[in-house]
């Protein structure tokens, strides 16, 4: 099982079809390169969410599918500060200690208008746990700043890639996967999980829904409506009676 976890870019915002987003393109690489293996695709991207919410929903939205490989990207929704470094580390530790022991790849997308992302803080966590990372800021964005690409070719709003932009992001990930595949038979020692580099207050965070708790309600009601589409994310919660 190949999983992707992040915000709106991972979700596939502004791609013309779900199959055009970077995540599905990378999933297609797995299927093409390992044709004799049944490979499942899980996309846990939710627009506008950070690793703070991500660490609380990781079990139900991706880990319960027992993934073998996860690409993680909260680099444009997390602020570049120590708070989100801590929530991000909690997410990484939760994934690394999951029974399926997934391999993790850190992805850092970027705001194309400003060059801002959280990769400095995220990559400090990645280096501590010896995890590989892909920087769109240091590749696609760098080419754009050098005049090799135009912003309008990549993204209409300065943040979310169009189909071509998603293809560029996928190409950077696939380039790395090709290099790993070329050396896949080499032995590697399994790393021991080190102590956390932050206070790590969020590793055990859990999202509570109407399935787990029955709070006293004042002005709200439970929402038992079933999910109606793949973009219908926020279910089993509560709805306000007034706007």
Where are these regions (language model features)?
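Active-site segments of SGNH/GDSL-like serine hydrolases
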Residues: 73-77, 86-124
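Alpha-helical scaffolding within the catalytic cores
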Residues: 1, 24-27, 51-64, 85-94, ...
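Extracellular serine-dependent O-acyl
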Residues: 103-108, 116-154, 167-181, 186
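Serine-esterase "nucleophile elbow" of acetyl-processing enzymes
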Residues: 1-44, 57-66, 234-237, 243
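Cell-envelope and extracellular/periplasmic
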Residues: 8-9, 13, 34, 43-59, ...
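Conserved catalytic region of serine esterases and O-acyltransferases that act on ester linkages
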Residues: 167-243
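Accessory beta->alpha helical hairpin/"wing" motif in late/C-terminal subdomains of nucleic-acid enzymes
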Residues: 161-162
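Sec-exported extracytoplasmic/periplasmic mature domains
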Residues: 31-32, 59, 63, 93-101, ...
